[in-house]
């Protein structure tokens, strides 16, 4: 397997220096590229992320019901949230993919990016311990944990963007599918989202049109909050 370039730079972006860089390399390796891929690390990272976020919400909202806690956790650990984190880290620049995935734009696919985030969490746990993971994840999620509230319907990104623009009496966003790749059973959709307040369009890539629209809408919301 070829070495993945610029791992020290990625470590700085993540805020964690690996003692064993082979773990990070494995976390970035898709199953299409090598036998030693990231799926087991993803399994581990998914569980660690769930317990850390559950613990944070439990202590942050002592009066919240189990239902509210579950809904907030689902919002924070779902695929589109992980995809936004992956994009912030520019993980697509570091992924090791097989030729087929590379050709079909796998470095932009939301499921691959989200899985890579979970795999990196698993790799950090194996390289350190649960407490290190907890502190790092709370740093990654600081802004999202500060904004989330119980008792509030955890609306999807498209709904939130629409309501935000309507509140300002602005035109609604325009979504256009600009590319579809892959076989019928394994397609990748690229969707462009345009709004009047941004000079450039924002792109979302996912395994369905709806997911791609959600990803694009979430990125627009992030830009509008800056």
Curated annotation (Swiss-Prot):
Start and end residues of each DRBM domain: 156-226
Binding site for Mg(2+): 42, 115, 118
EC main group: hydrolase
Pfam families per the UniProt record, alphabetical: dsrm (PF00035), Ribonucleas_3_3 (PF14622)
Subcellular location field: Cytoplasm
GO cellular component: cytoplasm
Keywords recorded for this protein, A-Z: Cytoplasm, Endonuclease, Hydrolase, Magnesium, Metal-binding, mRNA processing, Nuclease, RNA-binding, rRNA processing, rRNA-binding, tRNA processing
Chain ranges of the RNase III domain: 7-129
GO molecular function, one term: rRNA binding
Family recorded in the similarity comment: Belongs to the ribonuclease III family.
Protein name (database record): Ribonuclease 3
Organism: Shewanella sp. (strain MR-7)
């Amino acid at each position: 397997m070829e070495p993945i370039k610029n791992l020290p730079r990625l470590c700085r972006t993540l805020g964690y220096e690996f003692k064993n860089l082979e773990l990070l390399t494995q976390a970035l390796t898709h199953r299409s590229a090598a036998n030693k891929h990231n799926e087991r690390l993803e399994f581990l990272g998914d569980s660690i992320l769930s317990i850390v976020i559950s613990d944070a919400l439990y202590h942050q909202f002592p009066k919240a019901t189990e239902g509210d806690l579950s809904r907030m956790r689902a919002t924070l650990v779902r695929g589109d949230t992980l995809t936004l984190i992956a994009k912030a880290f520019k993980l697509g620049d570091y992924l090791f993919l097989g030729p087929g995935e590379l050709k079909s734009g796998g470095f932009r696919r939301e499921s691959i990016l989200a899985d890579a985030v979970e795999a990196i969490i698993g790799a950090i746990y194996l390289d350190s311990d649960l407490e290190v993971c907890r502190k790092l994840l709370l740093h990654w999620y600081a802004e999202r944990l500060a904004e989330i509230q119980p008792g509030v319907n955890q609306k999807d990104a498209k709904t939130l963007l629409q309501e935000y623009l309507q509140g300002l009496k602005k035109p609604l966003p325009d979504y256009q599918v600009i590319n579809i790749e892959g076989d019928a059973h394994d397609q990748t959709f690229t969707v462009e989202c345009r709004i009047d307040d941004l000079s450039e369009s924002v792109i979302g890539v996912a395994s369905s049109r709806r997911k791609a629209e959600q990803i694009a809408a979430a990125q627009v919301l992030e830009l509008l909050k800056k």
